[in-house]
């Protein structure tokens, strides 16, 4: 795979936006330089090869970001694929510059056990075009009563939430907070 050189782009670096050239090799930024093509008339949609056989794209008047993260998406698969699928949602995310999406657990089956979560994870492995990280449910079936098995789910989920439903019992919520903290996980409690 050839290196990609993005020239004259605006990059957030060392706490401020500045014009820089980036060289990317195998998906990683390997070099940052001052702009090399100032005043270039190369179109950003017409890449060319330079003397180092790098693919070069002029990014004048463009901002370069490594990728955005969406912490709250509804790729409603499994169970509600008539609304959205992991494939369609992740393709839309990629089109908008998102490289990571975290999926809410209001699915069927609810990812409240490792077995249920594995249904979703299999689809993610097969269909996602960006990194898709699932949330686990705080309670079984998102019913607000019995806690899901956090210890079992924690290695495979980004965090825990009963998205849009909530956990009304104060004691149950406290128990969830203690378990999440012990496992180094977050509880997502706000739905906007």
Regions found by a protein language model. Give the residues of each.
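N-terminal metal-binding scaffold of metallo-dependent hydrolase/deaminase domains
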Residues: 1-48
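Active-site metal-binding motif and surrounding structural segment of the metallo-beta-lactamase
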Residues: 43-64
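Short amphipathic alpha-helices and their capping/turn segments at secondary-structure boundaries
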Residues: 59-60, 90, 173-187
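Metal-associated gating/positioning segment near the N- to mid-region
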Residues: 62-124
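Divalent metal-dependent hydrolysis catalytic cores, especially in the metallo-beta-lactamase
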Residues: 87-111, 128-140, 154-168, 184-188
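Active-site-adjacent beta->alpha loops and helix N-cap segments on the catalytic face
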Residues: 111-115, 167-179
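Distinct, well-ordered alpha-helical segments
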Residues: 113-117, 143-151
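Conserved small/polar residues in nucleotide/adenosyl-binding loops
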Residues: 191-192
């Amino acid at each position: 795979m050839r290196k990609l050189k993005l020239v004259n782009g605006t990059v957030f670096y060392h706490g401020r936006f500045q014009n820089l050239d980036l060289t990317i090799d195998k998906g990683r930024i390997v070099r940052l330089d001052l702009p090399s093509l100032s005043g270039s008339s190369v179109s950003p949609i017409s890449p060319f090869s330079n003397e180092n056989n790098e693919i070069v794209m002029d990014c004048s008047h463009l901002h370069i970001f490594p990728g955005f993260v969406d912490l709250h998406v509804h790729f409603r698969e499994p169970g509600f694929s008539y609304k959205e699928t992991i494939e369609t949602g992740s393709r839309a995310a990629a089109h908008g510059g998102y490289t990571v999406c975290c999926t809410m657990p209001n699915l069927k089956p609810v990812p409240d056990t490792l077995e249920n979560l594995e249904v979703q994870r299999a689809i993610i492995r097969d269909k996602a075009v960006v990194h898709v990280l699932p949330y686990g449910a705080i309670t079984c079936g998102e019913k607000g009563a019995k806690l899901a098995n956090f210890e079992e789910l924690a290695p495979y989920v980004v965090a825990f939430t009963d998205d849009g439903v909530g956990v009304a019992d104060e004691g149950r919520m406290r128990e969830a907070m203690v378990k999440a903290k012990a496992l180094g996980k977050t509880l997502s409690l706000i739905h906007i």
